A protein has these predicted regions:
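Universal eukaryotic N-terminal targeting presequences
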Residues: 1-2, 24
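Bacterial N-terminal signal peptides that target proteins for export
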Residues: 2-15
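Bacterial N-terminal signal peptides
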Residues: 14-24
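Sec-dependent signal peptide cleavage junction
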Residues: 22-34
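N-terminal maturation segment of proteins
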Residues: 32-579
């Protein structure tokens, strides 16, 4: 299992690893002498087991891992051993936790204990179900993750370059594993759709041609941080070109030929509901992605209620201002440059959010081959020993030239979104390395969307316009999330999807409905952390408000909990709840 901790802002179809004050440990912990030590041992063993499972984890967790020797496992990990190895790691972690006397732990240890238990229990359940991983999913599939892993591979030393070459050389084996994974899924009846193959094949030319290859371009950009001489850099650049030409490009060519062959017999997208134990898998996916204990049908009702209320609010706004729709379309942000926007947002956040001091980041636009559909941007958090490495990448094909979209996206990924959220937690609450790997996506994305709404007033919008702008956006996300539940849990096709969407948006053509189905069926549950996360965050703050003297204090209490799932957050933060 390899972890690349991305926080990405997703976009609708047309109609976001970690710094540290001090490392918890850089060596494996030996036998514990008391309860608190037993817990420390359990937490750190779990973390290092994950590091061992795929050496690239070590690179993304530490900039300078001199005190730890990578395992002999392939750099990119192995699909063929993933479930077996994952189950072994999880069962070992569960056994270690069971030896801990919970009532004797510190308050912080109890929090991390519950976070670990939540993560372990859910992921052990995955191991009991068929493998319905969305291998070719355009947004969450392994190809987009692989490309990001390679292009974001930072280079701070000559040893990093040597390790990078090893990673490149591992790509042919890894792609072969991906094919084996697809064939395994085919053997259990879970066949990638025509849409999934088409999306995967779109980058064929870019990934099989050396000129302007994203891996080479990324290397040439990243290598500058090593401080090596031009001669040394040129020599390594030639080595990278050789490995790409002789090993990586042929491997991608063969991989894409296999996809082309399989595409010929592919069919239209259909949700998890059509597969054996698919509904059980989706129930688990919902709990995992949202951080709640709601069933899919409970979640559907919850989101439908939010949709109904939101549309009523919009209708009232339109009745007061018949030109509101045109006003929203013509909005412009006070800044139009991404870096200038981030600086402005940082200043605004400092006025009403808990202080995080000075922070740094690197901001850039993605090359065409890495521009994933429906994904506006992402934030890659910093290594445990290098808090200054905060990376934000923007997808220009999705952001376009809309300055308000860019403004809210920078609020989502930067200040006071993921970058700020991450930095505050690391400065004020972080103690265990494992915390950085097992948080809830629903919680982190919920915060990022919540502060998007706050940022609209910082852009100079009046309250009514800001509410209408944000409501219009989040309702689209909620509607797509309901479609996701319908497609993957209830087996919706075009007719059911059309009937639902028509209720809220008027009649839509067949192709538009099919686009929604394609998105939801090929990346199941991918939108749920955003819509559910936002609404649950809003609900949580409403319930917390009376217990805090100011919004700033309330935000501080929330942020100190990190990315703990809502099922736990509600017990810690809502008055009269106990844990």
């Amino acid at each position: 299992m390899f972890f690349l901790k991305l926080h990405a802002k997703q976009f609708l179809l047309s109609t976001a690893l970690i710094p540290s004050l001090a490392l918890t440990t850089t060596v494996k912990v030996h036998a514990a002498s008391n309860t608190e030590d037993a817990f420390d041992n359990a937490a750190n063993t779990f973390f290092w087991d994950i590091m061992d499972s795929s050496p690239i984890n070590l690179h993304y967790s530490f900039s300078f891992p001199e005190d730890y020797k990578p395992s002999d496992n392939p750099p990119l990990g192995s699909f063929s051993e993933t479930f077996t190895e994952t189950a072994e790691i999880l069962n070992r972690a569960k056994e270690n936790l069971s030896a801990v006397e919970y009532n004797s732990l510190t308050a912080k240890q109890k929090q991390v204990y519950k976070l670990m238990k939540h993560y372990i229990d859910i992921n052990l359940e995955y191991c009991t179900l068929p493998d319905y991983t969305s291998t070719l999913g355009p947004m969450s599939g392994i190809l987009s993750t692989l490309n990001t892993t390679i292009t974001e591979y930072y280079l701070l030393s000559e040893q990093d370059i040597i390790n990078y070459l090893d990673v490149l050389k591992d790509i042919p084996r890894f792609l072969n594993d991906v094919v084996k994974e697809i064939e395994h899924q085919e053997s259990i009846g879970y066949v990638p759709s025509l849409y999934a193959f088409e999306q995967a094949l779109e980058n064929k030319d870019a990934m099989t041609t050396l000129e302007n290859h994203p891996y080479l371009e990324a290397f040439e950009s990243n290598v500058s941080e090593t401080g090596l001489s031009d001669d040394v850099v040129n020599n390594y650049t030639k080595q990278v070109e050789t490995v790409l030409n002789n090993e990586v490009l042929p491997a991608f060519s063969s991989f894409y030929e296999t996809l082309e062959s399989k595409k010929a017999s592919a069919s239209q997208s259909k949700g998890l509901a059509f597969y054996d134990h698919g509904q059980e898998y989706y129930e688990l996916l919902v709990r995992d992605n949202t951080g709640t204990d709601m069933t899919p049908l409970e979640l559907k009702d919850y989101l439908t209620d939010k949709l109904t209320q939101g549309l009523m609010n919009l209708s009232q706004s339109y009745s007061h201002n018949p030109n509101l729709l045109n006003d929203l379309d013509s909005l412009t942000a006070p800044k139009t440059d991404a870096d200038a926007i981030l600086q402005t947002l940082n200043q605004k956040a400092a006025e009403c959010m808990p202080d995080i001091g000075d922070t740094t980041y690197t901001l850039s636009y993605l090359p065409e081959a890495l521009q994933v559909p429906n994904n506006l941007a992402y934030y890659l958090s910093s290594p445990l020993d290098n808090e200054s490495r905060n990376i934000i990448r923007i997808n220009p094909s999705e952001v376009g030239d809309d300055s308000m979209v860019l403004w809210t996206t920078m609020a989502h990924e930067g200040y006071p979104g993921h970058l700020y959220q991450h930095q505050y937690f690391m400065q004020n609450s972080f103690e265990y390395n494992i915390e950085t790997l097992i948080g809830s996506l629903g919680t982190s994305e919920g915060w990022a969307y919540y502060v998007e709404k706050l940022s609209l007033e910082w852009a100079g919008l009046d309250e009514a316009t800001a509410d209408a702008y944000f409501t219009n956006m989040i309702l689209g996300m909620a509607a797509l999330s309901v479609v996701d539940i319908g497609v993957n849990y209830e087996g919706w096709g075009i007719e059911e999807t059309s009937n639902f969407l028509t209720t809220y948006y008027g009649e839509l053509d067949k192709n538009t409905c099919q686009n929604f189905i394609d998105t939801c069926a090929n990346d199941p549950g991918v939108y749920l952390p955003y819509s559910v996360g936002y609404y649950k965050t809003e609900d949580l703050f409403e319930q917390m408000a009376d217990g805090y003297s100011s919004d700033k204090n309330m935000y501080a209490a929330y942020l100190k909990m990190g990315s703990m799932p809502f099922t736990l957050l509600e017990k810690y933060l809502i008055p009269d709840n106990s844990i």
